[in-house]
Amino acid sequence: MTQAGTTEPDDLALAAEFPAPERAAWQRLVAGVLRKSGALPEEFDGPPESLLTTRTYDGIEIQPLYTADDEAAPAGFPGLPPFVRGARPEGTGWDVRVLHANADPAAANRAVLADLENGATSLWLRVGGDSLAPAALGEALHGVHLDLAPVVLEPGEEYEAAANALLAEFAGIPDSEVVGTLGADPVTLRARTGEAHDLTPAAELTAQLAAKHPKLRTLVADGLPYHEAGGSDAQELGAVIAAGVAYLRVLTDAGLSVDDAAARLEFRFAATADQFLTIAKLRAARRLWARVTEVSGGTAHGMKQHAVTSTAMLTQRDPWVNMLRTTVACFAAGVGGADAVTVLPFDAAIGQPDAFSRRIARNTQSILLEESKLAGVIDPAGGSWYVENLTDALANAAWREFTEIERRGGIEAALASGFVRDRLAETWEKRAKRLATRKDPITGVSEFPFLAEQPVEREPLPAVVPGGGLPKHRYAEPFERLRDRSDAHLAEHGERPKVFLATLGPLASHTARAMFASNLFQAGGIEPVNPGAVDDPVAAFRESGAAVACLCGSDKSYAAQANDVAAGLREAGAIAVLLAGKPSESYRGITGFAYTGCDALAVLTSTLETLGVK
């Protein structure tokens, strides 16, 4: 009974008085909006919503709306094949894994203990090369209870020495209770360096340890090199599955069963700010691996997944925005069912992360796990028409990538022949074009830059020596190189390169394009000089001290004034005059155009060169 004494109905049919929604009605509304905005040509005869469809780098179509008509086949249950909804039946969140790569064992130990005392639950240690020496592993792990905080190694070429050093630290822990990952990954070594590395020693080490340490994993199939080379999600998945198959083959040759071999593997993936693709990638990966282990003669296996926030998406400029990127990526990795997640500190692209950035990275995971209750429901995205369709489409695309690699003799042969490099280069070319045109925007760098930001200073990372392996890209680098040139100019001349915004007409008619031009030029480190509404833009240009001008106004004001103002600007000393708008042959004296979808990198590079900025 309610307080008024009435009885509540068992079924509140709140929508009973409304007509049943129909797709056709929604399509008519979409058509009206698109037609009003000029995006729908009168002669267009397809479904209007098709103009809102986008494509991933794998060619997967993303529809603007998914309905019950798009319902996919049931994905099963967590802990059961095909493991789309999770490899673990209990779904108890994920392992908060922190990365340490400091070569100083004392400094590494201080950071390790600080992480473990403040929310981290496992450690990922880079060993060898410019990172921690295998012999220093004991000092770095001093005071760490290895039965409570598992260690995952990334040992590079020194995996045998690193493995022996870590195994020595397990003294006092029952052999059957030793957990962790030794991290041997000869396939990734080849991808990183271009040099062949024999898989057999790692397989033999695995066979030796299998019976003694049943919970210890020894090999990692890592997708990060393919992601960082600019690859698509399906290309990353296909290469990782192919690496996993290569390890299955060599492990079974060493005497392990398919099931025992599969239990020795861990898989690493990039988590990006594209949350739905990250969720779908992790779900699709488990489905693919279950299929591989099943057809290989074993039982369908779940996949031990380690998700790492993407280094490719990190920026050096306005690095605080990286906190937002890594939060979204961590959210997606958790929802996608990763067993362990590493959130890279926001300053990881600048230098050695400091205590503050490490704390923020840890707390990002703590908030999502504890405050947001993200782990309270297993696979919360499961059943979403969009997510399920995207998972299926990505799994199919990745399987095609995997079979192409297998057709060429497997991952080692495909790397050696250049097939993998060429496939990744094709995708990077497409991605680079979208980055340059800002169709893939980078907030704080290519869009909404903050020219007056104070640089974040960090201890430098070891210099990377280019090798013969896969390239490593960071999406913001081309724009950041322009900003570096601007900074050098500022240091030498006391001011930044400038562009005068020659505003035409009243404020209302020029503001939109003036704001667009201002945002664009700042992305290249060029300071915009905006005089506001002026009666004589040529006179204002003379007083500005700028050498390049950009007309900003409405199409109507361009038709009436652009040619005369451009001529006046050239007479006043402008060495180049650009126009904020689409190119047109009707304009005279215009040396370049800046508009939505233009090659912003080309416009900015050309402008800096015109201004003599080295």
What annotation goes with each model-predicted range?
Residues 2-13, 247, 266-447, 576-583, ...:
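Active-site capping/gating regions of soluble enzymes
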Residues 2-28, 37-39, 48-54, 58-84, ...:
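Intrinsic disorder at enzyme termini
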Residues 114, 208, 332, 447-448, ...:
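Hydrophobic/aromatic ligand-binding patch that stacks against planar heteroaromatic rings
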Residues 348-349, 384-389, 501-507, 538, ...:
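A short beta-alpha structural unit
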